[in-house]
Each structure stands twice: as C-alpha cells, then as structure tokens.
Curated annotation (Swiss-Prot):
Protein name per UniProt: Myelin-associated glycoprotein
Organism: Homo sapiens (Human)
One GO-annotated biological process of the protein: positive regulation of myelination
Residues modified by glycosylation: N99, N106, N223, N246, N315, N406, N450, N454
Primary location class: membrane
C-alpha cells in the first residue's frame, strides 16, 4: 500500500497499455458500506484504426452478453436502465477519453455482484470486455489482528474500511481499547488495483488479561446517521500460571488423598504430577487431579505439578504428610561390654509425628526423649548389675511399638556366700556358687589328698547355671567321719577366684547321720560293756567249763562305718581306701596303712542263760589307724 500522494499505479498501467487493442482495466473487486456510494474506476481501449465520431458504452450486471438480457446498469446512448439502478447509477468518466468509471449511489446488498462494461463505437464496432469488477456490500469494518499475539510483546491491530465513495468519507474510532493504548489514524490508503481504504492503527503490549478481550472499530459518516461497528476477540498467547493447588496435606495412613492442580494458559497446558522425578499422571487440561488410594508412609513427601506450553512453564509443589504409628524400634550399639567400660546404645524408629522414645529396665525408666526419632543411652562404667534385658518403647497418638534387647556385661568370677560344704550320713556335698560372665570353669581341690576335680568329671561334679550364677556341686561318699578340706576355684578370661568351702552345721549333721540306727548301735555297745564287766567278775568265781570253746568265726563288732564278718580288719581298711580313690577318680594302688589290732577273748559259757543278751556272747574288736 502507498499513500494518497503517490502516483496512481492503475493509471500508469492504463497509459502504458495503449497499443490499439480491445481491452479494459478495472479493479477485480471493490467494497462499499451499505447506504453509501461506490465509484468503480474503469479504463478501456480499442484499435487505433477505428476513429469513431462518438463513443458510447453500456454497463451490465452479472453477465457480459446482451443476448442474455442482463440488467442494464448504465447506457449512455438511451439512458434506459434496469429499475434496480434507477436514480442510482451514473457515469463519472468521459467515454471519449476512454474513461468508463461508474458511480453507484445508495448501494444496497442486492447490488452486490459482477459489473461488465461494453464499448459501442457504432455499427459493428461493439465489444463486451471480459474484465469485470465484483462489488461487495459490507456492514462492518475489517479489524486485522496479527496471526499470533503473545503476552508481553507489542502488537499492531488495524481497522480498515472501504473509502471508494467520493461523496462520503468515513471517520474511524476504536471501541474497548481502554488500557491497551492510544490509537493512531494513519489515513487514506490506496490499494494496488485502484481502490481506496481508510486505515486506523492501534499499538499496545497485551497481557494475559487481554486474552478474549473484544476490541471494536467504528466507521461513521459525518452529517449522516450511518454507523458501522466491527469487533474482534483478542487471542493472546501466554505461558501457564498455576492458579489452583492444595496447600500442605496431612493424612492418616490408609486414607484416601486427592491432590488438585489447575493452571491458566493459552493454549491449554500439559499438566504433569511428579514425585522425585517420576511422572505419576499427565494430561492436556486446565486442571488435573491426582488420586492416592490408601496412602502409606512411602508416599509421604513433596509432590510437584508442572504446567507447560509452547510459551513457557510454571511449577509448584505440595507436601503430603502421612501420619502413622511408630515402626518397631531398632537398636544399635555394643551389646557385650567388660565391667568398667562405657556403653552407648542407640534406639531409633520412624513415625509421623515423631514419637516419645523411652528405654526401660525392669520397669524402671533409664532415659526418654519427646518428639524425636532417636534416643541415646549412655552407661558409664557398667557393672554386673547393668546386665540384663532392656526395652525400647516408641509411641505417638497413632500407636506404640517396643523392642527388647539384652546387654551382656562380662566380668571376673565372684564366689558367693552360699558356697559351703555339708555332710549327710556317709556323704559330703560341696556347693560352689559363682557369679560370672562369661561362664567360668570350676574346679574343686582337696589339698590333703592332692586331688583336683573339675566339671568334666561328671561322676563327682554336677553344674547348673541360672542367669549369671553357676552352681557346681561336688559329691564325696564315705567321707562323713573325716571330711576333707575343699577349695573351690572359678576361672574365666577376666580372672580367677578361690575359696576354701566352710562346713556348715557339723554337729547337727553328725546327729542327723547317727539317727535311729546309730542310737540302737550305741545302746548295744553300752549293753556289751555292761555284760563284759559282769562276765569278768564272774570269771573270778566260776571255773571255766570245758564244754565252752570259741567258734571258728566268732561274731565281730566294728564301728558303724565298718561292718565285715569273717574277714581280717586290715583287708577292710585297704578296701575302703581303694573305694575312696575310685570315688575321686584316681588310679594306682592305695597306700599301705599301719593298722594295730587288739582282740579280747571274753570267755566262754557252757550254756546260754535265758536272761543273757546276745551281745554277751560277742567278741570285742578295736581298729586304730596310725
């Protein structure tokens, strides 16, 4: 387009085309507002050899062929026109100058169509030109918006109206442009084919709020009531902005959670829900809902909504906090310690909210923290009393969990006061009670016999452990008369302790050993002594009867521990010592014992008196160990 002051190109083309041929030049299309007028510029030519005295012309509507009887718009020869054009058409050009410009007034929609010109030079020199002009009757201004309007980028919007009526000139104004910018009327412009337009330009920088805004242009004609308005909706492109989203969400484990993300953009955005870089759901939409069924602690965290289109992107995050009961606590630390060392134990768990952590031992609270996931227990200089079972308990308003753990304190053996020896009848039992960790090895030493017995000799030693206390029992048989000294020694990798075991309740044990049988034996010995004295006295007065003689195997009375008939006393002593060595698990020959024997013949009586006790007939023997 060029300004009005420029040389009309159309007329240059007409002038340059003169060459003596039949031809016409007019705009292929032309527009006019209803109720106004329109001037259709036209030029024609004919061969130079034709020199007509008068040149006539005819304008036809919608057909160039007279035989079709098209409506006559204008006819210079007769001035007879179709009724639709009565008083509406006239020729502005001079046909003698080959100017066929036509003016139509008070145009209406039914006048819209094709217009053809026919030259009449007289006789057979008549020619209907194929070139024609299409008239368009309009009612609205033409608002031209750039194909792409981007928020933040300056744009130019134009309003264009036809200005082909020399009698009425349009005036343009903008409607709904408040806040957009001030319009600039550029003026009247000529188009390439010789038609004219009135143009007004509006420059502004659109915002996202301008999207969908109706911008209007009005064409009015002074001194008339004619007004024409046109509108265009602004299609402003802009990047997404997230306008709707959940705030931080708290949910109980196992419940249903919905997260909503809504964005404003043009065109609509691609919405994506993500967590830790993983796409959970996406769609091209203005809003997107993320459904989480039966949430677990693993779904606790930060969720991101990303909105993007060709013009940019936006993102926002929302935190999901899943509330749940504490997990079973885990315990880390030294579970085995040596007496005197410092022990540090860490109890930890996971929950939401953070729990109350407590460490118990035997229902006694040792340490506790509130709303923390870790608890450190410090035990300086541990002792055996610290050994045992502990509990770490975690709780919040959603539940409670606990974990038990054991602390093992290792220490050197300690011989307890319960250790002792006791005699019962012909048996001696020695108890060695040891507290130790780890379990000790226990040995019993008999110094007087140079004998050591340990736990491996199950025939003599029985051991039983209860917690940190080990009880070892040594059993000696046939030792009640002269119980030996017994020393108990307990040993582990942290040391050794020895103790000579005391005999408890010796006098009570002796009478318990004697018991009813011992009382009978003692009474029999007493009767024998009385009988012996009586018999001795009688010997002085009574002559020995020849019929009384000692038997081959007279009855013999030993102590309560040794009762053997028909065997020498020396053999009995040797047998007993051998038995004792077998009791202690010793090998070898028993040592020789120096035994002295004393035997008394208490005399014989020829007959047995009915009042004489059986013991009166017994011999008395005594064995001494030197």
């Amino acid at each position: 387009m060029i300004f009005l002051t420029a040389l009309p190109l159309f007329w240059i083309m007409i002038s340059a085309s003169r060459g003596g041929h039949w031809g016409a030049w007019m705009p292929s299309s032309i527009s006019a507002f209803e109720g106004t007028c329109v001037s259709i510029p036209c030029r024609f030519d004919f061969p130079d050899e034709l020199r007509p005295a008068v040149v006539h012309g005819v304008w036809y509507f919608n057909s160039p062929y007279p035989k079709n009887y098209p409506p006559v718009v204008f006819k210079s020869r007769t001035q007879v026109v179709h009724e639709s054009f009565q008083g509406r058409s006239r020729l502005l050009g001079d046909l003698g100058l080959r100017n066929c410009t036509l003016l139509l007034s008070n145009v209406s929609p039914e006048l819209g169509g094709k217009y053809y010109f026919r030259g009449d030079l007289g006789g057979y020199n008549q020619y209907t030109f194929s070139e024609h002009s299409v008239l368009d009757i309009v009612n609205t201004p033409n608002i031209v918006v750039p194909p792409e309007v981007v928020a933040g980028t300056e744009v130019e919007v134009s309003c264009m109206v036809p200005d082909n009526c020399p009698e009425l000139r349009p005036e343009l104004s903008w409607l709904g442009h408040e806040g957009l910018g001030e319009p600039a009327v550029l003026g009247r412009l000529r188009e390439d084919e010789g038609t004219w337009v009135q143009v007004s330009l509006l420059h502004f920088v659109p915002t996202r709020e301008a999207n969908g805004h109706r911008l209007g242009c009005q064409a009015s004609f002074p001194n008339t009531t004619l007004q024409f308005e046109g509108y265009a909706s602004m299609d402003v492109k802009y990047p997404p902005v997230i306008v709707e989203m959940n705030s931080s969400v708290e949910a109980i484990e196992g419940s249903h959670v919905s997260l909503l993300c809504g964005a404003d953009s043009n065109p609509p955005p691609l919405l994506t829900w993500m967590r830790d870089g993983t796409v959970l759901r996406e769609a091209v939409a203005e809003s997107l809902l993320l459904e989480l069924e039966e949430v677990t602690p693993a779904e606790d965290g930060v969720y991101a909504c990303l909105a993007e289109n060709a013009y940019g992107q936006d993102n926002r995050t929302v935190g999901l906090s899943v509330m749940y009961a504490p997990w079973k606590p885990t315990v880390n630390g030294t579970m085995v310690a040596v007496e005197g060392e410092t022990v540090s134990i860490l109890c930890s768990t996971q929950s939401n909210p953070d729990p109350i952590l407590t460490i118990f031992k035997e229902k006694q609270i040792l340490s506790t923290v509130i709303y923390e996931s870790e608890l450190q227990l410090e035990l300086p200089a541990v002792s055996p009393e610290d050994d045992g079972e502990y509990w770490c308990v975690a709780e919040n308003q959603y539940g409670q969990r606990a974990t038990a753990f054991n602390l093992s304190v290792e220490f050197a053996p300690v011989l307890l006061l319960e250790s002792h020896c006791a005699a019962a009848r012909d048996t001696v039992q020695c108890l060695c009670v040891v507290k130790s960790n780890p379990e000790p090895s226990v040995a019993f030493e008999l110094p007087s016999r140079n004998v050591t017995v340990n736990e491996s000799e199950r025939e003599f030693v029985y051991s039983e452990r209860s917690g940190l206390v080990l009880t070892s029992i040594l059993t000696l048989r046939g030792q009640a008369q002269a119980p030996p000294r017994v020393i108990c020694t307990a040993r582990n990798l942290y040391g050794a302790k020895s103790l000579e075991l005391p005999f408890q309740g010796a006098h009570r044990l002796m009478w318990a050993k004697i018991g009813p049988v011992g009382a009978v034996v003692a009474f029999a010995i007493l009767i024998a002594i009385v009988c012996y004295i009586t018999q001795t006295r009688r010997k002085k007065n009574v002559t020995e009867s020849p019929s009384f003689s000692a038997g081959d195997n007279p009855p013999v009375l030993f102590s309560s521990d040794f009762r053997i008939s028909g065997a020498p006393e020396k053999y009995e002593s040797e047998r007993r010592l051998g038995s004792e060595r077998r009791l202690l698990g010793l090998r070898g020959e028993p040592p020789e014992l120096d035994l002295s024997y004393s035997h008394s013949d208490l005399g014989k009586r020829p007959t047995k008196d009915s009042y004489t006790l059986t013991e009166e007939l017994a011999e008395y023997a005594e064995i001494r160990v030197k």
